[in-house]
Amino acid sequence: MTTLFISDLHLEESRPDITGAFLTFLRDKALGVERLYILGDFFEAWIGDDERTPLQEQVAAALREVRDTGTDIYLMHGNRDFLIGEDFCARAGAILLDDPTVVDLYGTPALLMHGDSLCTADVEYQKFRANMRNPQTVKMLLSRPLKDRQLMARQLREISMAKNQGKAETIMDVTPEEVVKELEAHNVQLMIHGHTHRPAIHELEANGRPARRIVLGDWDENVWWLEASKNQPVALRHQPLADF
């Protein structure tokens, strides 16, 4: 039995190489595994399930094919695709997860998160996040015409890129104290998240015991995934995108 974790693919029409790598990953790595978790920022942008672009339909069909072979697929919102809804998940055969969620990873409780909520030093972003995730805000956004949402997504992306260029790297990384706080709040010793694009396995202490924080990598020059098996230690793996 094997479980795979990925995040931060940022799928978009302008990067067909990443889409192609993902489809190959599904065929070569995900087929036949027990579970596949996608922990946010699966798409570069998502403005509602009603958009239904050729890329989205292609990805949904590919996921459904994997699901139909017996692999359970779980999808968590990221900061760029938090408007993914149940309609897309139904087409893809995926189950939408809350952020955070604790799962049983072969006898070890694991706390799964996208990771943006851990970056508490970026106060401005956390205020923006709280506003955008408010159910009333989400309802208002989805009620607007599709063209308005498409324009808004482009504008927000441009604003985000401009603001991030002026921010210190430390602000955009997780706050160590917040990591410990979440581990202790959920009484677990293992956290898995994405968002920061800084793949690594960190050793720390929480609940008075050793703990680990595993950071998934973004898909750009490399394809990153975490592999967990019943009788093997977790392994953070990567291969050049060009190899897929």
Swiss-Prot record:
This protein's record includes keyword Membrane: yes
Any Gene Ontology CC annotation: cytoplasm
Binding site for substrate: 79-80, 122, 160, 164, 167, 195
Cofactor details (free text): Binds 2 Mn(2+) ions per subunit in a binuclear metal center.
Positions that bind Mn(2+) 1: 8, 10, 41, 197
Recorded catalytic activity of this chain's protein: UDP-2-N,3-O-bis[(3R)-3-hydroxytetradecanoyl]-alpha-D-glucosamine + H2O = 2-N,3-O-bis[(3R)-3-hydroxytetradecanoyl]-alpha-D-glucosaminyl 1-phosphate + UMP + 2 H(+)
GO MF terms, alphabetically ordered: manganese ion binding; UDP-2,3-diacylglucosamine hydrolase activity
Main localization of the protein described in the UniProt heading: membrane
Name of a matching Pfam family: Metallophos
Cofactors named for this entry: Mn(2+)
GO biological process, one term: lipid A biosynthetic process
Protein name: UDP-2,3-diacylglucosamine hydrolase
Organism: Marinobacter nauticus (strain ATCC 700491 / DSM 11845 / VT8) (Marinobacter aquaeolei)
Taxon lineage: Bacteria, Pseudomonadati, Pseudomonadota, Gammaproteobacteria, Pseudomonadales
